[in-house]
Amino acid sequence: MKKIICSLLFIPILAACKKEETAPTEKTYSVKYEVVGTPQQNSNISGSISYISKNSPTATGSWSISGWSVTESNWALKPGDKVGFTATLSNLASYQAAIIVDGVMCEFDLAATTLPLNYPITLSYTIE
C-alpha cells in the first residue's frame, strides 16, 4: 500500500519536471539567389528560373544578358525551412550559381565545358 501511495505521489512530480518542447522561432533573413553565365560561342543563353520566394513556393524569373539575381528581404524563416531555385537554361558554356543568406554564401555551384550545359541548375539550402 505504501509503495502505491509513493508511486502516485511521484507521478505529478515527474509531470511537473517534464521539459516542454518549444517550436522553432522565426528570424528575419535576407536571401539572395544568383546565377551568372557565359554563353556558348555564337549563341544566346535562354531558359527559365523557378524559385521559392517569401510570397510563393513557385515564383518565376527570367534570364537577362548579365544573368539572374533576386533578393528576398525581411523573410521570416525558422530552422528547417528550405529555400532554393532551379534554373533551366540552355547554351551555357559556364556558370556560377549561389544562395546567399544574410550576406553569407551558403550554397555555391559552378561548371565550365566546351559542350553546351543544357541541364537544370538546382540549389537549395535549409535554414539552420
Predicted regions and their residues:
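Bacterial Sec-dependent N-terminal signal peptides
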Residues: 6-7, 11-35
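First exposed extracellular module after export/assembly in secreted or surface-exposed proteins
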Residues: 24-128
